[in-house]
């Protein structure tokens, strides 16, 4: 009878040891899952940049200023986003054209407002390829 009791106690100790090992394994697995989700979250952050932010990284300071001006001009729903879908080179040339036209209106706020209205009208249906020809300021 003593031998059976001793064997039974040994069996319980072994069984208890196996269960505690499973707990450690579960904790390790949950820790790995948590680490993976944290890594995924940090990897997703760079992808969340908007088209505007990605474009701004490639623009000069003058071009950024013109982009801000254009953003205030294109107030219609989705018009500025539609503008950002164009090719980067076309966007840069449009921003340079805006700069030259606004420089013509130096100190003439009425001319700048007229040009802003012209730009709004152009982007309501115009193609960016014709922007430099069709959107011009009236001030000299």
Curated annotation (Swiss-Prot):
Q: Which stretch is the leader sequence?
A: 1-17
What Pfam families does UniProt report for this protein, alphabetically?
Answer: Mlp
- What's the main place this protein lives? membrane
- Coiled-coil intervals: none
Region Disordered: what ranges? 22-57
Lipid sites, type S-diacylglycerol cysteine: 18
| Lipoprotein keyword on record | yes
User: What is the similarity comment for this entry?
Assistant: Belongs to the Multicopy lipoprotein (Mlp) family.
The job of this chain, per UniProt, is described as: An outer membrane protein that may participate in pathogenesis. Some human Lyme disease patients have antibodies against this protein. The Mlp proteins probably undergo intragenic recombination, generating new alleles.
What protein does this entry describe?
A: Lipoprotein MlpG
Provide the species name.
Borreliella burgdorferi (strain ATCC 35210 / DSM 4680 / CIP 102532 / B31)
Upper lineage is: Bacteria, Pseudomonadati, Spirochaetota, Spirochaetia, Spirochaetales
Q: Which gene underlies this protein? A: mlpG
